[in-house]
From Swiss-Prot:
This is P2X purinoceptor 2. It is found in: Cell membrane. It catalyses: Ca(2+)(in) = Ca(2+)(out); K(+)(in) = K(+)(out); Na(+)(in) = Na(+)(out). Fast activation by external ATP. Exhibits slow desensitization during prolonged ATP activation. Not sensitive to the ATP agonist:alpha/beta-methylene-ATP.
Length: 471
């Protein structure tokens, strides 16, 4: 029967573990070069290195331009101006009426359809049938003094006939008649596709002290006769409204009836290592509001025009549907800088070592002679002091370049340890200074290992416990 393993107290085990961790903290590791002559492993190693180099050269340096210092989000100013006239069923509309607000900022609306409720005055009238709990059968259904936040006025407590039809609604005091009862629709979209929009944009990158605008520096009246064309008139930022809607992939008639939000996106991506003439704006157009969501699609707003008739304040309430234009500017500028170049070069050179790590893992895990490779790859050198306290032990003796001291036998003169004791002796260092072995080859830091691909793994003989005879 096998002898029972000794059981250590829990405290002793913890102390041994702590001492082992403390001792391992002060170990020093130095790389050891082993040349393994294996074609498949060598091809894999060079292939991994090539892939890493291609990634850094093509993607990191050419595509991402990581050798440059960059700045995003330029300082920007936008001035807009709309021109054109249109007609509806009842009148002619000019810019002052259909553009809101008139200041010409980065966000503005062009009205394409209106629902107007004329001659509203303060008085009593039937509530809109669309308001919740507005319908009634008798005065008992209407509570006097009740105010509905989604309604049009203060309820008087009377149930009165609606504007048209047999229905009845509660009477309210407010601006009468209410919107749904007397509104008139007018469509302005007949000539709207021909409206012209001037978008003047200037950007500045403060880090690089670089500024530029999107209008050509010409004094011959160029802007009065040009319209935008990406190839021939890039610096003529005058767009037709129909062109913007078409580029956004929308139907102008549908958009004019329901309203919507169109984004004009100006992108300034500038490589400042090139001349300033190579830094040009790029325009794109897309719809910003979710048109397929009924609850939030479309765009409309209300405003009123006030006047007096015989001393009575009167107003015209207008519910306007239109196309809102949002001008959005973004960009990025880059210029060569030594610091990011050095950082990315160092990262590239360091990443090449991934190939060595991968091949080492394959070598020590899947190759036929993995135990022999492990022995060649990892050495443990213990350098305790002599009993007399002599220190230091020279590095040449540790690496095996110096001959052993007189009176010490070499490794070949020592008897082979019994089976099962070799691993214990290799893992621990005795209290006395052990004999240092000379390096078995000429170079202390590089070893040559031949690994024929077809050679099967062989078991080590008792006279060669480490399997070195296979090398």
């Amino acid at each position: 029967m096998a002898a029972a393993q000794p059981k250590y107290p829990a405290g002793a085990t913890a102390r041994r573990l702590a001492r082992g961790c403390w001792s391992a903290l002060w170990d020093y590791e130095t790389p050891k070069v082993i040349v393994v002559r294996n074609r498949r492993l060598g091809v894999l190693y060079r292939a991994v290195q090539l892939l890493i180099l291609l990634y850094f050269v093509w993607y990191v340096f050419i595509v991402q331009k990581s050798y440059q210092e960059s700045e995003t989000g330029p300082e920007s100013s936008i001035i807009t101006k709309v021109k054109g006239i249109t007609t509806s069923e009842h009148k002619v509309w000019d810019v002052e009426e259909y553009v809101k607000p008139p200041e010409g900022g980065s966000v503005f609306s062009i009205i394409t359809r209106v629902e107007a409720t004329h001659s509203q005055t303060q008085g009593t009238c039937p509530e809109s049938i669309r308001v919740h709990n507005a319908t009634c059968l008798s005065d008992a259904d209407c509570v006097a003094g009740e105010l509905d936040m989604l309604g049009n006025g203060l309820r008087t407590g009377r149930c009165v006939p609606y504007y048209q039809g047999p229905s009845k609604t509660c009477e309210v005091f407010g601006w009468c008649p209410v919107e749904d009862g007397a509104s008139v629709s007018q469509f302005l979209g007949t000539m709207a596709p021909n409206f012209t929009i001037l978008i003047k944009n200037s950007i500045h990158y403060p880090k690089f002290h670089f500024s530029k605008g999107n209008i050509a520096d010409r004094t011959d009246g160029y802007l009065k006769r040009c319209t935008f064309h990406e190839a021939s008139d890039l610096y003529c930022p005058i767009f037709k409204l129909g062109f913007i809607v078409e580029k956004a992939g929308e139907s102008f008639t549908e958009l004019a009836h329901k309203g919507g939000v169109i984004g004009v996106i100006i992108n300034w991506d500038c490589d400042l290592d090139l001349p300033a003439s190579e830094c040009n704006p790029k325009y794109s157009f897309r719809r910003l509001d979710p048109k397929h969501v009924p609850a939030s699609s479309g765009y409309n707003f209300r405003f009123a025009k006030y006047y007096k008739i015989n001393g009575t304040t009167t107003r015209t309430l207008i519910k306007a549907y239109g196309i809102r234009i949002d001008v959005i500017v973004h960009g990025q500028a880059g210029k060569f800088s030594l610091i990011p170049t050095i950082i990315n070069l160092a990262t590239a050179l360091t990443s090449v070592g991934v190939g060595s790590f991968l091949c080492d893992w394959i070598l020590l895990t899947f190759m036929n002679k993995n135990k022999v490779y492990s022995h060649k790859k990892f050495d443990k050198v213990c350098t305790p002091s002599h009993p007399s306290g002599s220190w230091p032990v020279t590095l040449a003796r540790v690496l095996g370049q110096a001959p052993p001291e007189p009176g010490h036998r070499s490794e070949d003169q020592h008897p082979s340890p019994p089976s099962g004791q070799e691993g214990q002796q290799g893992a621990e260092c005795g209290p006395a200074f052990p004999p240092l072995r000379p390096c078995p080859i000429s170079a202390p830091s590089e070893q040559m290992v031949d690994t024929p691909a077809s050679e099967p793994a062989q078991a080590s003989t008792p006279t060669d416990p480490k399997g070195l005879a296979q090398l």
